[in-house]
């Protein structure tokens, strides 16, 4: 347990340039508190002490803003940066050396029982606001862009962006747009621009029908 905690603290220093001291990390990093609380909750969950496990999970959620179901299986050195709004579902599994930013959801797609949440491999980065949904596999060494919605499994050494998520880089070779948060697809903006073009055509007499969408 102590080795696990030391490894988690080391991961914070490796991933966050704002971390200045061990005391600061231990006392002020909500992501660390959520992960350590989950270790206790998960142990109780495996002992079928479900109420106690959920109670610890809820208390942790209240203080950290991070919701991790006690049934979730989490590997070593998980770093949750900022953390507010992160949700990790019951049947989710997370490998080692994973970094998750605020607003990320690792959730299901419906009310089905059984395995319904994603499996996350090792060395994965999931950027702010991304949603990874359903019983899918995110293999190792994957980057998922901010606000992406991933609904299908992703092979190793890939970069995924967009809604729905699509691969833009695989095995170091670019297959689409670069992994740059400034240039992620914005479906709402694209729809507005489409409507503006349709309205302009209507004004110019190119479209006669009143229904332009």
UniProtKB/Swiss-Prot annotation:
GO terms for biological process: cysteine biosynthetic process from serine. Its EC number is 2.3.1.30. It is found in: Cytoplasm. Pathway: Amino-acid biosynthesis; L-cysteine biosynthesis; L-cysteine from L-serine: step 1/2. One of its GO terms (molecular function) is serine O-acetyltransferase activity. Pfam families: Hexapep. Keywords: Acyltransferase, Amino-acid biosynthesis, Cysteine biosynthesis, Cytoplasm, Repeat, Transferase. Gene3D superfamilies: Hexapeptide repeat proteins, serine acetyltransferase, domain 1. One of its GO terms (cellular component) is cytoplasm. The keyword Cell inner membrane does not apply. It comes from the Bacteria. Transmembrane segments: none annotated. It catalyses: L-serine + acetyl-CoA = O-acetyl-L-serine + CoA. Belongs to the transferase hexapeptide repeat family. PANTHER family: SERINE ACETYLTRANSFERASE. This is Serine acetyltransferase. The gene is cysE.
């Amino acid at each position: 347990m102590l080795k696990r905690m030391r490894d988690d603290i080391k991961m914070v220093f490796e991933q966050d340039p704002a971390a200045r001291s061990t005391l600061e990390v231990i006392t002020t990093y909500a992501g660390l508190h959520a992960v350590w609380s989950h270790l206790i909750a998960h142990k109780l969950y495996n002992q079928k002490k479900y109420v106690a496990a959920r109670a610890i999970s809820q208390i942790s959620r209240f203080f950290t803003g991070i919701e991790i179901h006690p049934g979730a299986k989490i590997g070593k050195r998980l770093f949750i940066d900022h953390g507010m709004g992160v949700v990790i579902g019951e049947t989710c599994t997370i490998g080692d050396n994973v970094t998750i930013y605020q607003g990320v959801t690792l959730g299901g797609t419906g009310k089905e029982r059984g395995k319904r949440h994603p499996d996350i491999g090792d060395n994965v980065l999931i950027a702010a606001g991304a949603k990874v949904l359903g019983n899918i596999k995110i293999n190792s060494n994957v980057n998922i862009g901010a606000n992406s919605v991933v609904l299908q499994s992703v092979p190793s050494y890939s970069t995924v962006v967009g809604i729905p998520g699509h691969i833009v880089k695989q095995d170091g070779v670019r297959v689409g747009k670069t992994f740059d948060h400034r240039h992620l697809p914005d479906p709402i903006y694209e729809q507005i621009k489409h409507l503006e073009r349709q309205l302009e055509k209507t004004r110019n007499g190119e479209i006669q029908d009143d229904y332009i969408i």
